[in-house]
């Protein structure tokens, strides 16, 4: 009897880094927490998570500035650790996250890590909200970040880092970073989670109007990089990243998602895997995968998106 290709793909995924294995167990194999949580607990002890933590200094930083030197800065190192699934409450992550509240919190309630202008940076504020929520840092200042983001939501439902400079149309990039922060806040049982769900719904509609990657006026592809799946996505939007958010939020079926789902299916290889299609230029401590080669990260995310899609259709 021939083996099921999907089973072969899952076995291949399980031979990857521990950061992938625990998510495969949770999201694709539907294993109980008693099985995948011990695997997740290893993320900071071996593999990519441990390698990244070794570059952190005693102050909790990866670089002197919180944001400079993409992608080895403290900001993007923490964002990657969240993607890897470093467990909530990890002391090294908690120490680093608090630096943003102690050193980069402005009077407007948001985070500014560049100080090149006086207004807080919406995209980074969304990232930091996600970090504080994922790592279960219940500092009361977290609510200031949330308030800032809710106040920055634009009329079309999304967000744009340049709103204070006159932008009137939301940014795909900023919106997905904020949405991930709001989602982590809800998952962390934040006290304003009902209000946050309403904001999420408005922002999902912004993406749906655009089919996640098209102009709402012409229907043409807004940016070809939106159709090329990267990991880590850094601050960039692409179709797979944002579909994975829709999955994580357990969004309802909407026919406007048929288009981006078809794009994901089109990119599946004959062996049931997905390639790494894009890498955002910048310095890294190490590379996890190679562009043009089969990607466990993209395969994991695509499969769990498709599982969600099959469930809600």
Language-model features: locations:
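Preference for long, amphipathic alpha-helical scaffolds in soluble/luminal domains
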Residues: 1-313
């Amino acid at each position: 009897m021939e083996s099921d290709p999907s089973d072969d793909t899952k076995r291949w995924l399980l031979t990857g880094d521990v950061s992938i294995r625990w998510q495969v167990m949770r999201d694709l194999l539907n294993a109980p927490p008693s099985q995948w949580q011990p695997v997740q607990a290893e993320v900071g002890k071996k593999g990519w998570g441990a390698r990244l933590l070794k570059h952190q200094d005693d102050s909790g930083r990866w670089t002197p500035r919180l944001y400079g030197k993409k992608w080895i800065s403290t900001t993007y190192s923490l964002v990657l650790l969240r993607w890897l699934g470093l467990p909530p409450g990890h002391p090294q992550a908690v120490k680093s996250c608090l630096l943003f509240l102690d050193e980069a919190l402005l009077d407007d309630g948001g985070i500014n890590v560049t100080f090149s202008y006086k207004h807080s940076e919406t995209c980074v504020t969304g990232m930091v909200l996600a970090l504080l929520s994922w790592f279960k840092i219940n500092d009361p200042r977290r609510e200031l970040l949330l308030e800032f983001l809710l106040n920055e939501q634009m009329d079309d439902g999304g967000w744009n880092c340049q709103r204070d400079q006159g932008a009137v149309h939301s940014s795909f990039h900023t919106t997905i970073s904020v949405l991930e922060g709001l989602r982590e806040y809800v998952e962390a049982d934040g006290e304003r989670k009902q209000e946050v769900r309403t904001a999420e719904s408005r922002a999902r509609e912004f993406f749906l109007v655009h089919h996640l990657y098209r102009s709402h006026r012409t229907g043409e592809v807004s940016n070809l990089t939106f159709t090329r799946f990267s990991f880590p996505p850094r601050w960039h939007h692409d179709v797979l990243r944002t579909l994975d958010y829709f999955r994580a939020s357990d969004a309802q079926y909407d026919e406007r998602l048929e288009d981006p789902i078809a794009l994901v299916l089109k990119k599946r290889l004959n062996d049931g895997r997905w390639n790494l299609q894009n890498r955002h230029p910048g310095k890294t401590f190490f590379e996890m995968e190679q562009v043009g080669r089969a990607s466990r990260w993209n395969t994991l995310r695509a499969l769990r998106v498709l599982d969600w899609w099959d469930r809600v259709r």
